[in-house]
Amino acid sequence: MKKYLLLALLPFLYACSNSPNQGINYDEAFAKDTQGLDILTGQFSHNIDRIWGVNELLVASRKDYVKYTDSFYTRSHVSFDEGNIVIETQQDPNRLHNAIVHTLLMGADAKGIDLFASGDVPISSRPFLLGQVVDHQGQQIANQVIASNFATYLIQNKLQTRRLQNGHTVQFVSVPMIANHVEVRARKYLPLIRKAAQRYGIDESLILGIMQTESSFNPYAISYANAIGLMQVVPHTAGRDVFTMKGKGGQPSTRYLYDPTNNIDAGVSYLWILQNQYLDGITNPTSKRFAMISAYNSGAGAVLRVFDNDKDMAIYKINQMYPEQVYRILTTAHPSSQARNYLLKVDKAQKKFRVRR
């Protein structure tokens, strides 16, 4: 399982906030973070192995909310990408009922919520999933009475069972989210996005496109590079760059970055750094946008090295090209397949948000 877990974590190690800051060595900070993470994930995977068996690891990530409760015998999984909620337990249906209610009524505030512990997430008077899920009568799930009635309906009418490889029996329910759940989540953050866009001079649709690609507007998002929140900011790289730009010392805390206001401000600040510092010499705005998107994922240094090992020569070559050429090169010649796909995804998402405005 340990080998499986490490393989599962590898795609996240290059999440969006690999800072392009030249000349600053973050190896020591990264080593400390990953050592602590190794201990945490080792303990966590041991619990899941013991209770659920092999090949049953589910863990919170950028676009997946996963919360274990009841000493890890019950879990809730919200796939913000697929738009589906699965809640399952190895205990009695009362525990399933409790988990359904708490999941449907969880708040949007991820600060202080330990996704690797086994306690319940508090019920909120302003549920994050409000407007994204409806009950069996088509009504919004706005309070505990509606959520409890829906949970009872699901257990009485939609309960399913499956058997794990370790012989344990699991009871579960599956709840689809509404068709436009992504748009509903995006709208929750539009005021903050517009404020940051105006403050830093960054296109609103670009912020939306990056946020959808990074987290699918999941406020609980986390990667195993310790990228945090809606815009997946890594504290010791992009976060440190942003704090330096703002005249602050150190780096943002996890709690700081789980605040949507802080997270969006930090992510958009980092885009400003890419636009006005690391990639400042690129003259065509469309070419610069393509470079910024790719750099948000892989770092400005990696982007420029696609064109030339010398920074000034790389910028000169970019400026001799049409934007379409820059796009083609970054989506075909970048050594990172993740970075190649990232530009494709963000550009597509940005176009979608431009149309909807």
UniProtKB/Swiss-Prot annotation:
Membrane protein topology class: Lipid-anchor
Sites of N-palmitoyl cysteine lipidation: 16
Principal cellular location given in the protein's record: membrane
GO biological process, any: cell wall macromolecule catabolic process
Leader sequence residues: 1-15
Residue numbers with lipid attached (S-diacylglycerol cysteine): 16
A GO CC term assigned to this protein in UniProt: cell outer membrane
Stated family: Belongs to the transglycosylase Slt family.
Functional note: Murein-degrading enzyme. May play a role in recycling of muropeptides during cell elongation and/or cell division.
PANTHER family, A to Z: MEMBRANE-BOUND LYTIC MUREIN TRANSGLYCOSYLASE C (PTHR37423:SF2), SOLUBLE LYTIC MUREIN TRANSGLYCOSYLASE-RELATED (PTHR37423)
NCBIfam families attached to this UniProt entry: PRK11671.1
Protein name stated in the entry: Membrane-bound lytic murein transglycosylase C
Native source organism of the sequence: Haemophilus influenzae (strain PittEE)
